[in-house]
Amino acid sequence: MWEITVVGEVRDYSRFLLFENMLKSNYDNDVIVAISLTKSSAKLSIAVKVKKLIHTIKRLVIELILKICKEEYFVENLQIDTDDKDMQYFIILTAVMSNLEDEIDYAMVKFKFAKMVYIRSLLRFRLSRLYFLWEKFAVYFNYNMSRGIGQEIYLNFLKFLASNSRNGKDIIYLEDIDNHMILKDKSKNVLVSIPKSDEISIVVNLIIFAPNKLIINCYGVLSDKIANLIKYLFDDRVSILI
């Protein structure tokens, strides 16, 4: 049995709860998860009973850690000149997801898993190169996007990302299944499942996968605001709207 305890701050507790729910939904019989909370810390303990799942769970743990630290960094360092809270969250989430898979690959090679991992110490002392990359992104963003021009420049920035992602897919299907929006590749393999209520994450994931053709099989499910945003970002790549 492989075990790990991830130690974070009290504010990480809600993220740990979401992570616990995800693991229980997908690996309930093969993974044991427990969360504890004190006045000064939150702890996420995981035990993997099936050997073939260890690599997968390690990647998920690294992804969780990187998302927490990366979001903190960009919230503090990106200069987003808009009062639109949705747009602020949208920009932050897109920045967090940008190059995330490459960063996970890097962390998996550089980091040797111990029984206990302290989230912010791991980034600061073991994976400090990632902070350098995030700083470069923030400097570029702040120089080019933070000049009081307004919302249009942010939309153009997102459109640029949607056209230039390194993870670009030929075809993405977007489907509505059991109160979740499912992204599938051209072979109909599930790439990601997102709660229908989290529409911003739906768009962010579409930007990250940057399909050459986007086939939407859930007409009327998305809000008008999000549907129009998808049409704007992907333009003529939205080839079928059923």
Regions of interest found by a model, annotated:
Residues M1-I200, V204-L206:
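Conserved mixed alpha/beta catalytic, RNA-binding, or beta-rich assembly cores of soluble enzyme
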Residues D185-I242:
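C-terminal structured domains
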